[in-house]
Amino acid sequence: MAVAIICLCGCAPDDIDISGYADQQIAIDGIDEDTVFVSIADMKALDCVTIKTESTSDKIGKVRATGPTLETVLAAKGADIKDIKKITFHGADDYEYSLKEDYIAEHDIILAFGIDKEPLDEEDAPCRIIIPESDSAYWLRMLDHINIEMK
């Protein structure tokens, strides 16, 4: 069974050097008529959490992920996570998956810019989705686009 610990203090996002991908942006469609963007530097400036977790599939092992929650990022862009009907995450490697409102309501979704107190590796950057206590298939790498369908 996966164990998740969420810390709001001491996550020390400033300790993670994102300089190699700080300016990379994630496109978000569905909040407004126009696509909005959030850079990794913008995300690092938000309230961040640190999660210690392990995927239920044990394919990845234990990680300590740091970044803002999806809810925090959306709030910074003027959207409420409770108004989402469906969300689709897209990776630069063409991997994608969707989550419906019931799953979103029941799980914390972390947009991690650091793993184990280190910047993301090239194959994971600029952002990795981490959903504690979930299968690693939901831990999308190289996030570059989020598509939101509002209620």
Question: For each predicted feature, which ranges?
Answer:
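Sec-dependent N-terminal signal peptides
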Residues: M1-V3
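C-terminal motif of bacterial Sec signal peptides marking the signal peptidase cleavage site
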Residues: I6-G10
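N-terminal intrinsically disordered, low-complexity segments enriched in P/E/S/T
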Residues: C11-K151
